[in-house]
């Protein structure tokens, strides 16, 4: 797997941005730590999917990674679930909450979908949502389940392009 990368470094002509380094990495684990932490700490990301009518749909999400894929967990039947099942191209934006000029945008494709009810792999979806709850709200198991039989779905998103901007705050 090869992931194209680009670092946006400074304003260019006519209020556009110039791209600095372009490169390639082989996996999310190869990202520079100054950006990888945006998907390893409790930063709320924004997921962009495409609706049936072609319009974008944005959702704040908790996010993780497995070294290769970005992990997105949701309730079966939600709009983002339906969109990712029908159209596998997505984008994820992670912005440093302390510095809005330090961010990472990831374009990718859904390569695997695991429903909690899958007898072979379903525990991955349950484990992931519980790990996210521990990281983001310091509690486990995930406490916000719909008591009417909610089924969680874990989407594995394979990055195809990563754009980064700005250094993290000093200190």
Residue ranges of each PLM-predicted region?
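Short beta-strand segments
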Residues: 42-76, 84, 91-95, 103-106
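Charged, gly/pro-rich active-site loop segments
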Residues: 1-29, 102-171
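A generic structural signal for nonpolar/aromatic side chains embedded in well-ordered alpha-helices
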Residues: 38-39, 84, 132, 157
């Amino acid at each position: 797997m090869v992931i194209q990368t680009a670092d946006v470094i400074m304003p260019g002509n006519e209020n556009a941005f110039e791209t600095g380094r372009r490169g390639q990495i082989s996996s999310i684990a190869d990202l520079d730590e100054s950006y990888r932490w945006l998907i390893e700490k409790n930063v709320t990301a924004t997921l962009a999917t495409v609706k049936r009518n072609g319009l974008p749909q944005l959702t704040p999400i908790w996010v993780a990674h497995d070294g290769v894929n970005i992990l997105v967990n949701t309730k079966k039947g939600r709009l983002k679930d339906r969109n990712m099942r029908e159209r596998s191209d997505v984008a994820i934006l992670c912005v440093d909450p302390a510095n809005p000029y330090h961010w990472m945008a990831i374009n990718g494709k859904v390569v695997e979908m695991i429903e909690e009810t899958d007898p072979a792999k379903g525990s991955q979806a349950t484990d992931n949502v519980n790990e996210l709850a521990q990281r983001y709200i310091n509690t486990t198991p995930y406490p916000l389940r719909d008591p009417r039989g909610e089924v969680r779905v874990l989407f594995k998103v394979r990055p195809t392009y990563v754009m980064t901007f700005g250094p993290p705050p000093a200190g």
